[in-house]
């Protein structure tokens, strides 16, 4: 999308963190933004601060996401940009988790994206000049690590859903585009998101402090929500499928694909009658 002035955007998880940063950047180029969030007090504060409308929405419930879409269409008449950004990020070892832990995170991180697509895509397809869906995954949607089982499962899912959606939209000749946002370390409150969970005390998932996790060589290369917002804005303009926020941290992703390639090569060597994909 080239001309963004007066376009209509919906940002879930938009009352704080990356969602707020995305909303601010969209506003800066003339986009009319509606934020949705599960936290009513945060919605009220951010809506007042930015001078925009906020609608309390639990993305894990399709009825609420559908109601959000209908309200936006009723009040604004169109939706051009959808940022499925709401997410949670506590951690826990798989052996310590409950099934409720898995359901809680998948309901928000993965089903929240699916709900957004199903509720809004028909409206985006009505636009003469198309639209854009940006789904927030994570670099943990391409690599995995101990303690991140449900989180990685949900974010891998978001990557796959977005890839398939982009392929299908292209196949049908649609002017709607899809991108997946792959953020690295960002200064948000996602690591303390279990505050929104009623049964958090009994859960195997616990809030984390990224400063205590040895994932990087040297200081953690934090980005701010507004920096992430600029990357999203650039992605809407370019139509790029994969929106990396920390490309300098991509080596583990490449290493993973090399391990996959190695396993494939070993399988070919063990079964010489198969032809090499080269």
Regions found by a protein language model. Give the residues of each.
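A glycine-rich helix->loop->beta "capping" turn
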Residues: 50, 71-82, 90
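Canonical Rossmann dinucleotide-binding motif of NAD(H)/NADP(H)-dependent dehydrogenases/reductases
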Residues: 2-32
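Active-site helix of classical SDR
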Residues: 117, 154
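Substrate-binding pocket helix/loop in short-chain dehydrogenase/reductase
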Residues: 93-94, 101-103
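Residue(s) in the substrate-gating loop at a strand-loop-helix junction
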Residues: 138
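The beta1-alpha1 cofactor-binding region of Rossmann-like NAD(H)/NADP(H)-dependent oxidoreductases
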Residues: 57-67, 99
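SDR active-site lid
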Residues: 171-243
């Amino acid at each position: 999308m080239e001309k963004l002035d007066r376009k209509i955007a919906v940002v879930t998880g938009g009352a704080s963190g990356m969602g707020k940063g995305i909303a601010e950047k969209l506003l800066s180029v003339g986009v009319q933004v509606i934020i949705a969030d599960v936290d009513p007090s945060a919605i009220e504060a951010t809506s007042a601060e930015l001078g925009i409308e906020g609608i309390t929405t639990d993305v894990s419930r399709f009825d609420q996401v559908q109601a959000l879409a209908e309200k936006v269409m009723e009040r604004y008449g169109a939706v051009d940009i959808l940022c499925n950004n709401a997410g949670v990020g506590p951690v826990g070892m798989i052996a310590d988790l409950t099934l409720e832990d898995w359901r809680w995170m998948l309901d928000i991180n993965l089903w929240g994206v699916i709900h957004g697509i199903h509720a809004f895509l028909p409206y985006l397809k009505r636009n003469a000049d198309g639209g854009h869906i940006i789904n927030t995954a994570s670099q943990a949607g391409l690599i995995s690590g101990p303690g991140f089982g449900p989180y990685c499962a949900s974010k891998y899912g978001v990557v796959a859903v977005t890839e398939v959606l982009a392929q299908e939209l292209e196949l049908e000749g649609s002017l709607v585009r899809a991108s997946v946002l792959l953020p690295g370390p960002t200064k948000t409150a996602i690591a303390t998101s279990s505050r929104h969970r009623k049964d958090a005390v009994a859960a195997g998932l616990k809030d984390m402090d990224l400063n205590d996790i040895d994932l990087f060589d040297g200081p953690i290369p934090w980005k701010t929500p507004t920096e992430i917002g600029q990357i999203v804005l650039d992605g809407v303009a370019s139509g790029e499928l994969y929106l990396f926020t920390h490309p300098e941290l991509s080596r583990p992703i490449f290493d993973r694909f090399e391990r996959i390639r190695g396993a494939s090569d070993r399988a070919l060597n063990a079964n010489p009658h198969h032809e090499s994909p080269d």
